Amino acid sequence: GNMIIDIGGGTSETAVISLGGVVTLEAIRVGSFDIDAAIQTYVRREHGIAIGERTAEDIKIQIGTATPMPNERGAQVRGRDLVTGLPKNIMLTPEEVRFAIDEVVSQIVNSVTRCLSKVPPEMAQDFLQRGMYLVGGGGLLRGLAQRIEKETDVPVRMSPMPLEAVVLGAGHCVENYQVLRSMFMGARR
């Protein structure tokens, strides 16, 4: 069997797939948009400035990490001062961002752990050897694979094309529909 962790914008799904079917699935309505929102909330509460969704996403991409990383640097952030209404610059550190997003990241990691706990024992050996596969844009958060690996003791492999993995898989299913047809017919809705 294979274990896939898909972290999208609004949801995170972890599934174990074996012999053309889903063995176990754990899905939560938490994703990378929630990480962005947590950054916005933190900057508003701790620094008194409002930032937009795009700025929060830029912060996540530039200095966001799920675990401490070597050679971390802060970033200059520009927003609107909540008191004066004027533009204001602040310096934001990676430690602050990690603190801001920790609750969201923990929910994602806990979801992976719950899915792992439902895996039949005979399949556990597969994951210990091959590991889990991380896909989706949310999986690009630096240090996330390492944090999942640390908290589950199972290797995590990043898809070489995490943003395209889901659509490529769907395309593969369409191209090979006749071969995979029995899997689709047996799928639960």
Name these PLM-found stretches.
Residues 1-22, 71, 142:
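Gly/Thr-rich phosphate-binding beta-strand-loop-beta motif of the actin/hexokinase/Hsp70
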Residues 6, 39, 112, 134, ...:
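Residue-level signature of catalytic and energy-coupling elements of molecular machines
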Residues 52, 71, 172-189:
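Acidic, glycine/GT-rich loop-and beta-edge segments that sit at the periphery of enzyme/chaperone cores
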Residues 68, 124-148:
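Glycine-rich phosphate-binding loops at beta-strand->alpha-helix junctions
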Residues 100-128, 173-176:
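Phosphate/ATP-binding catalytic cores across multiple sugar-kinase/actin-like superfamilies
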Residues 146-172, 180, 187:
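Conserved phosphate-binding/catalytic loops in two-lobed NTP-binding clefts
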